[in-house]
Amino acid sequence: LAPRLPIETVAAGGGSVLELQGERLRVGPRSAGAQPGPACYRAGGPLTITDANLLLGRLQVDRFPAVFGPTRDQPPDAEVVRHRFAELAAALGQTPERVASGALQLAVETMAAAIRRVSLHRGEDIRGGVLVAYGGAGGQHACRLADELGLNTVLLHPMAGVLSAFGMGQARQRCRQQVHLGAALSPELLAALPDQMERLM
């Protein structure tokens, strides 16, 4: 057995692509990634959860660094987001704001389903628990996610946007090595263990 952390990934992040599947809106699992990124990054990317947050005023464009576009000196492009959502909304017979809000709700439901699945699998009752939000967009969805899960408390660390990197930087360095012997336990195997351990050092 190899040591590992039980991590469940969910395709509902800021880069999750919004697209039509027949007459239904789909969120993820495809991601725009960092390149080209969301439509607002000015690199020709698709509509994403980030763009939905921007359209609904949950992202403050004037607070973003001007690092977008071909010369990397422009703010996020709110105009292209409005235009692209208008096209998507027309195809669905809805308003752009309703489509964006629906996309966020789909993302929250996807995240909530993953948390429920993991907690049920482990036999844990999360009622009365605390939802810890981290990541660049963690705070944008934490309260809606807590409501969806029936949780009353959300912990949003002041460094939530860089919490993973911060934790990695604070962790003690260590090296763990192992070898698979593929043999039945016997006196001969026990006698050979010191040599095997020496090779791992």
Description of each model-found segment:
Residues 1-201:
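N-terminally biased helix-coil "hinge/interface" segments that flank
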